[in-house]
Design a protein with these regions (language model features):
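Transition-metal
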Residues: 1-133, 195-221, 246, 315
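His/acidic/aromatic-lined binding-pocket segments of jelly-roll/cupin-type domains
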Residues: 82-83, 91, 113-116, 153-154, ...
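Short, structured beta-strand/loop micro-motifs enriched in basic residues and often containing a Trp
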Residues: 140-148, 270-274
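An exposed, glycine/acidic-rich loop-and-rim segment of catalytic or binding clefts
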Residues: 143-150, 161-163, 169-220
């Protein structure tokens, strides 16, 4: 039994920057690198195992061929995706469909997601919901381009958390570094892209009708995270919903853990330490991402670290 440390793809974006390199030391393809798909089995960017007996396997292959590592799940598709996003400019104002709409129209799951704010510049903000009271008002404000009248802006700071269910109008603003936990989907409907053009002089495609089909009325409710503290561990349940549960762990010393989920997706956001599994010691550092599979029933971590950890739930 051993952890699965991962090597994962980068994605360049019109709104990306270089903080994936400056903050985490990752090799990036350009100064417009927007996303690191840190734990992914999605065909648009698959993680590879880089250690142990499964070194060289990609995650989708391992999930299909070795289901026992994941608790013999009912689903044939790895359900979650962990990303780090570096927003050097506004992302498009967008929305994601739910599972029913996504499967019918795009052939893949919808996307419910959540954001942990790793860092944010002073004055940074996101778009989180909208002000329209009816579908008719929503369509009218979009058609008129009355974005100030439509969009709900929310200031953010380091350590904030936001739950973004499917159907939520949203956008991430410049100066924000985010860890995103989401359903494994790459379907995005753009409502507004700030009229910008790519390096070829073209505006990016918008998806107004699809957006109107799936947008929710009203703003999402962002629950208050619950924290449990011991001497060496501060464990905060950021969200638990029908798709996933996400925790933030702040460790300051030696902590023993027992597996209470089929498997865990783990990301080290700061600090360093060691993890011991079956008498084997693994070094942990900022920027590491790994899976603790089903056969890892207990382990200990020693060090000063902040981590975000998640597991899937039955939808």
């Amino acid at each position: 039994m051993e952890p699965l440390f991962l090597d994962s793809p980068m994605h360049e974006k019109i709104w990306g920057g270089n903080r994936l390199k400056t903050e985490f030391g990752y090799d990036i393809p350009s100064e417009y690198t927007g996303e690191y798909w840190a734990i992914s089995a999605h065909p648009n960017g698959v993680s590879y195992v880089k250690n142990g007996k499964y070194a060289g396997f990609h995650l989708a292959e391992l999930y299909k061929d070795k289901p026992e590592l994941f608790g013999n799940p009912k689903t044939s598709v790895f359900p979650l995706l962990t990303k780090i996003l570096d927003a050097n400019d506004w992302l498009s104002v967008q929305v994601h469909p739910d599972d029913a709409y996504g499967l019918e129209h795009e052939g893949e799951l919808g996307k419910t997601e959540c954001w942990y704010i790793i860092d944010a510049e002073e004055g940074a903000e996101i778009i989180y919901g909208h002000k329209a009271q009816t579908k008719e008002e929503l369509a009218s404000l979009i058609e008129a381009g009355d974005w100030d009248g439509l969009l709900s802006r929310t200031p953010v700071k380091k350590g904030d958390f936001f739950f973004v269910p499917s159907g939520t109008m949203h956008a991430i603003g410049p100066g924000i570094l985010i860890l995103e936990t989401q359903q494994s989907s790459d379907t995005t409907y753009r409502v507004y892209d700030f009229d910008r053009r790519d390096d070829q002089g073209n505006k990016r495609e918008l998806h107004i009708q699809q957006s109107l089909d799936v947008l929710n009325l009203g703003n999402p409710e962002n629950s208050v995270p619950a924290t449990v503290k011991t001497l060496q561990l501060e464990s905060t349940c950021l969200t638990s919903n029908s798709f996933f549960t996400v925790y933030k762990w702040k460790l300051s010393g030696l902590v023993d853990f027992k597996q209470a989920a089929p498997y865990l997706l783990c990301s080290v956001l700061s600090g360093n330490g060691t993890m011991t599994i079956d008498s084997r010691i693994y070094c942990l550092k900022k920027g590491d991402h790994f899976i603790l599979p089903n056969d890892v029933t207990d382990w200990e971590i020693d060090g000063q670290l902040e981590m975000v950890v998640s597991h899937p739930n039955e939808a």
